[in-house]
């Protein structure tokens, strides 16, 4: 099952990065500096932005849906990393393409945007692609 594969991959990848990642869901959010992710995105309190562009987002076990971005998994090291070193990764799909997004945002802004960018980490991108297409 793909979620078990991703969990195993994130445990191994986290070790190589010296970080400890935990899985979160639409029912159980991570606390990122007081923001509950992905809850604040899914309930509309905060608008998700990818590369500065606001997008709609939804939780999707299958990776398909109507929104701009389908969130299939959330991983974070926020419980174990110190202040300003916390990461939240969203694993999902944009226009049916697998995409791993990351945020380290630690403060609010007037637009209530939660800013994500596609991860620059090729090992992480390739790992997710292999699980999706494997």
Q: Predicted segment positions?
A:
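Mature, Sec-exported extracytoplasmic domains of Gram-positive
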Residues: 1-134
């Amino acid at each position: 099952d793909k979620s078990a594969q991703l969990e195993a991959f994130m445990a191994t990848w986290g070790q190589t990065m010296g970080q400890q990642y935990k899985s979160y869901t639409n029912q159980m959010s991570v606390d990122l500096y007081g923001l509950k992710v992905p809850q604040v995105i899914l309930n509309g309190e905060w608008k998700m932005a990818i590369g500065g562009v606001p997008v709609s987002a939804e939780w999707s076990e299958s990776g398909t849906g109507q929104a701009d971005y389908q969130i299939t998994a959330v991983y974070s090291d926020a419980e174990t990393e110190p202040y300003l070193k916390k990461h939240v990764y969203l694993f999902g799909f944009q226009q049916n393409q697998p995409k791993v997004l990351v945020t380290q945002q630690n403060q609010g802004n007037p637009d209530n945007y939660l800013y994500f960018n596609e991860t620059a980490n090729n090992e992480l991108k390739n790992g997710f692609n292999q699980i999706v297409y494997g």
